[in-house]
A protein has these predicted regions:
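Sec-dependent signal peptide recognition
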Residues: 1-7
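Hydrophobic h-region of N-terminal signal peptides that target proteins for export
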Residues: 7-15
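Acidic/polar, glycine-enriched structural segments that form the non-catalytic walls/loops
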Residues: 14-100, 160, 165-167, 172, ...
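The feature captures the catalytic groove of carbohydrate-active enzymes
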Residues: 22-38, 45, 137-149, 165, ...
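Active-site acid/base region of carbohydrate-active enzymes
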Residues: 59-70, 80, 101, 105-108, ...
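Alpha-helical support elements that line or immediately flank enzyme active sites
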Residues: 95-128, 284-297, 350-363, 372-373, ...
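Short glycine/serine- and small hydrophobic-enriched flexible loop segments
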Residues: 113-116, 153-160, 225-236, 291-294, ...
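Non-catalytic carbohydrate-binding regions of carbohydrate-active enzymes
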Residues: 237-273, 302-475
Length: 515
């Protein structure tokens, strides 16, 4: 069906990059994957939908560019039309642990991170309403808390990109209800939250279990980020009592988190067992706090980042690994549960770690263990990981559930093939982010609460362009041309808002400008 489109900008400015920039990729994806699995937008309309919706990227790294467009092509497949509006799915095929319309809340925050860069805002509006007001009497959807989430923080981050205050403030009471529900379900007497690893979407972890009630860096980071976001939204709504209440919650959680989750012996944020002792393993979830700017710039927390490039820590050819490789329980299992978090590389975790790394490089005084070069290496590994060897021997962009971090084989997929239970469950799995990492990390558009454009690239190419980016009701173009001979728009870094140049630098460096 043809879909009418709703745009933030009143009129689209002239494009620097034509749609032919990516049309051949779309045609390639159709040839590679002729299964015609999709939701509301059929493959026959994929190019038109992408042309009308996505930021257009051109850069010298053709494989990164190819994966960027593949991820948008795949994201589109997961937009499902229901009698109550649009939802996003994780799996294209039905799974038993989903709720209505095959929806699952586990990767909700990542769905919002990606979708905030679409020009049609209805998808996320409907999707958020489904989870926050789709339950009994307009309450939370009944399976929403099946998994931990950072929804309030994701809604705030969406506002940082689109600037739609009316939509944001309208969510406040639902987000408060969400937070209070988590408090009633998971808050412990010491002020932190507990969670089972499977309800973090991270089953078979070294530190957790399906029945144990451990204090995990994940849910406690999410709850801090949610409290902080609710306080900020309340301030915009003029509800000072709510603002003060949630500022106090956030302040208390941050101090407790840093005091209790930091293991000074391992120099890492770690899980606490029910008996109050550390689980005694560094896991990739220890980087989650930086994805939300939780750790303060003190106490040597930056030491944790040395593990990311250590082959005995998390570094691997198709990593990072989800647990440190030096631990005796680290394993890449060929038996048991298909989905294990005791070693395999998960795009879900990699997405959060790369967001965390970009935040450290932008918002902190970065430790020596994390540099733009290291960030680009890790992003390159993530890009390389998202591929599949097809029956004809060619290699195409692809994303599934988890990877063997040493071979790059999609592990759950391979195990199911071995067991003769494979049915394509994880094909084009919508459980991670990529476009948002390119836009906010590599290209460096850093969304802000004020009416300011800030760009701080982590790329080191001689040229790139990100075009038609919706931001605060405008369409942005971020263009870097070292010599001025590639795009013929002048030399240097230039930022345009609706075709009007608003910022310029001769070097590839931070720029900012008022809209």
């Amino acid at each position: 069906m043809k879909l009418a489109l709703i745009f933030l900008a009143a009129a689209a400015p002239a494009a620097v990059l034509p749609s032919s920039t990516f049309q051949h990729y779309v045609e390639e994806f159709h040839r590679d994957y002729p299964d015609h699995l999709y939701g509301a937008i059929p493959d026959s309309e994929a190019f038109d939908w992408m042309k009308a919706n996505i930021p257009v990227l051109s850069c010298p790294d053709r494989e990164l560019e190819r994966v960027y467009y593949y991820r948008w092509w795949a994201y589109r497949k997961h937009i499902e039309s229901t009698p109550h509006g649009f939802v996003l799915t994780e799996f294209l095929r039905p799974v038993k642990h989903s709720t209505d319309y095959n929806a699952i809340s586990c990767a909700l925050g990542l769905h919002v991170a990606e979708g905030r860069w679409l020009r049609d805002r209805r998808y996320l509006e409907d999707y958020l309403s489904f989870w926050l007001t789709g339950g009994e009497n307009g309450g939370l959807e009944r399976h929403y808390h099946q998994f931990s989430n950072w929804t309030a923080s994701a809604v705030w981050d969406r506002w940082l990109a689109d600037g739609d205050t009316k939509s944001l403030v309208a969510r406040l009471d639902s987000l408060i209800a969400d937070y209070r529900a988590w408090e009633s379900e998971r808050l412990t007497p010491n002020g932190l939250f507990w969670q089972r690893d499977v309800s973090d979407g991270m089953e078979s972890s070294i530190s957790g279990g399906r029945r144990v009630k451990n204090l995990r860096p994940t849910i406690n980071t999410y709850m801090w980020a949610n409290a902080k976001a609710i306080a900020a939204i309340a301030a915009l709504a003029g509800r000072d009592d709510v603002r003060r209440e949630y500022e106090a919650k956030a302040s208390n959680l941050r101090q407790l988190f840093q005091k209790l989750h930091w293991n000074p012996k391992d120099q890492f944020f770690e899980t606490l067992l029910e008996d109050g002792k550390f689980a005694g393993v560094r896991e990739e979830i220890g980087y989650t706090p930086w994805a939300f700017d939780l750790p303060e710039q003190r106490n040597g927390y930056g030491e944790a980042w040395k593990q990311l490039t250590d082959p005995k820590g998390f570094y691997a050819p198709y990593g990072p690994t989800t647990a440190e490789q030096r631990h005796p329980e680290f394993v890449i299992a060929r038996k048991g549960d298909d989905c294990q978090w005791n070693g395999p590389s998960w795009p879900f975790a990699t997405s959060i770690t790369l967001r965390a790394a970009a935040n450290v490089l932008d918002d902190y005084a970065p430790p020596q263990f994390l540099t733009p070069e290291i960030y680009r290496d890790l992003l390159g590994i993530y890009t390389k990981s998202q591929h599949l060897k097809l029956p004809d021997g060619s290699v195409a962009p692809f994303v599934d559930e988890n990877l063997d971090p040493f071979t790059g084989i999609w592990l759950a997929r391979d195990l199911k093939i071995t067991k003769h239970t494979y049915y394509g469950r994880g094909d084009h799995y919508n459980h991670s982010s990529y476009a948002d990492l390119i836009i906010t990390g590599l290209i460096g558009l850093r969304p802000r609460a004020d009416n300011t454009i800030e760009v701080k690239p982590l790329a080191n190419w001689d040229w790139f362009c990100l075009d038609a980016v919706p931001y605060h009701g405008h369409l942005l173009t971020i263009l870097w041309d070292k010599t001025g001979q590639h795009f013929h728009r002048g030399q240097g870094l230039r930022v345009f808002a609706d075709d009007r140049e608003v910022a310029h630098s001769d070097r590839l460096a931070r720029v900012s400008a008022a809209l």
